[in-house]
C-alpha cells in the first residue's frame, strides 16, 4: 500500500470516527490523547521528510498506519474541524492565499475544465484544513474507480462537517469567545509544549505551528459537538412540557364549574371567578410571573403566539371568548383607579378627547383609567358638555327623537333592499365602537347559531348609532339618554299592543321557546324569532314583553330555566293567562319617566 493510500484512509477514518462513535472516547484520558496525538504528528512529519531519501520505508509506514488507534484518528479530525472553524471566522484567509498561489502556478492557457474543477475542490479542502489539500497531490489520472469513490466520500464528509460547524450557534459561540480568551489559550499551549522539551528545534517549530493548536481545542470542541444533535430537540421538549402543564392547569380549573349549574348570564358567578383565579395563579407559577407581570401580559396589545388566552377560554368553554377577555382585563387591570369621576378628571378627559378622540388606549394611559371607562364617560356624559339637559323629556323632544330614529331605520331598510346592508352595518359599527379595535385581540369562534338559515334583515339595535342620534338631537341629550328614552317608548307602545294578542299567538311563542331548548333568556334572539312567526304580526320587543309577563304566573320562575317555564305554561288549558290586569298594572307604573 502506498503513502497516498494511507493518507486517504486516514482522513476518511478520521472524519467518520470523529463525527460518530469516536467522539465518545475523546475525553476519557486527555493527557494520553494529547501525548499520542503529538507523537503521531511528529512521526508523520519525519516520514514526509525522509520519503524521497528512502523509498523502501513505505512498507514500514503502512504497518505503522494499521496500528493507529481511534484517539489518533479523532485528533486528526478535530484538527480538521477546528481549522475549518478558524478559517471561516477569519474570512477564509487560507482560501485567498491558496487561490493566489494557484493562479500563479497555472498560468498556461491550455488548462482544461477537468483540471480547473479539481483545483476548485482542492481550494475548498484547503479552507477546511490546509493539510487536506495536499493529499491529492500524488494522485494520477489513472487511479481506479474504487480509490476515486473513496476520495469523493471523504470530500463529502469534510464538506458536511464544515456546513454543520458553520450553521450551528454553539460552534459560533465557541468561535466568538476564541479571540477573547487568547491569553488563556497561550498558557494552555505552553503547558502542552512542556512535554516536547526533548524534541529537535526544527521539528518543534513545525509542531507548534500545526498540530498543537488543534489539540488544545480538541476537548472544547468535543464538548460542543453533542449539542448539535441534542439542543433543538431539548428546546422542543421543554416547550412541550410547559404547554402540557398549562393545559393541565386549565383542565383542573374547569372542574370547579358544575355543568348542571353553569351560567350564560352576563355576570360571572363566584365559581367562575374562582376557576379563572385558580388558572391565572397556576399560569403565574409555571411562567414565573409576578402579579404586575401577569397584568401587563393580559393588557399587552401585541399579537403574540401565546397559549394564555387559548387555555383560559378552556376554563369556561361555554362562554364566548370576548366575554372572558373583557372580564379578565377588567379584573387584572394595570390602571391606578376606577372610582367616581371628579369634575377635574372630566375636564382633563375633555381636553384629551378634543385632540385624540377615539384613541382610548392612549387616553386611558394618560388618565390612569381603563380605556373603556374613558370611552363611556366621554360618550355618555362629558361630550355634550353644558348643553346636556338633565330634566324630564318634553313632548317635543320625544317627537324629535322618534323622527331621527325612524329616518335612520328607513335608510337602513332601503340599503337592505338594495343589498348594501353589510356596508351600512360596517360603517355604523366603525363609528359606534371607534377605538375598541386596539383593545380586543381575541375573536369569538363560538358565535350563537342562527335560528334561521336565511339571510336576515338587521335588527334595529344593530342599526341605530346612538352617538349619531345624540348629535342629531343637537347635543342636548347624551347617547345614553337617547337610548334609555327610546327603549322606554318602545316598551310603552308594545305593552299597549299585546293587550290584544290572541291565545294562538301566545301558544305559538311558548311552544317555539320550549322546542328550541334555551336555558337562558340571553340566548334568545327575539327579533329573529319574530321573523319565524307566520304573518309576522309582532316585533321582537313585543314577543319578549309577552313572555316576560306570562312567566310571572309560574311559581318561583326566577329559579327556573326558560325551557322549564315554557313547558309548564304550555301545559295550561288553552294557554289562557290573565294578561290584561298585569299589563294594565305595569303600564300605569311607566307613566313617570326617568332620565
From Swiss-Prot:
Domain of life, source organism: Eukaryota
Bias type Polar residues, positions: 163-176
One GO cellular component, as annotated: nucleus
InterPro entries: DMTF1_DNA-bind_reg (IPR051651), Homeodomain-like_sf (IPR009057), Myb_dom (IPR017930), REB1_MybAD (IPR049260), SANT/Myb (IPR001005)
SMART domains membership: SANT
SUPFAM superfamilies: Homeodomain-like
UniProt keyword Nucleotide-binding present: no
Subcellular location: Nucleus
Sequence ranges assigned to domain Myb-like in this UniProt record: 385-490
DNA-binding region per UniProt: 360-382
Residues annotated as domain HTH myb-type: 333-384
Compositional bias of kind Basic residues: 114-123
Listed PANTHER family: CYCLIN-D-BINDING MYB-LIKE TRANSCRIPTION FACTOR 1
Function: DNA-binding protein that recognizes sites within both the enhancer and the promoter of rRNA transcription, as well as upstream of many genes transcribed by RNA polymerase II. It is essential for cell growth. May stimulate or inhibit transcription. Specifically recognizes the sequence 5'-CCGGGTA-3' or 5'-CGGGTRR-3' (where R is any purine).
Name recorded for this polypeptide: DNA-binding protein REB1
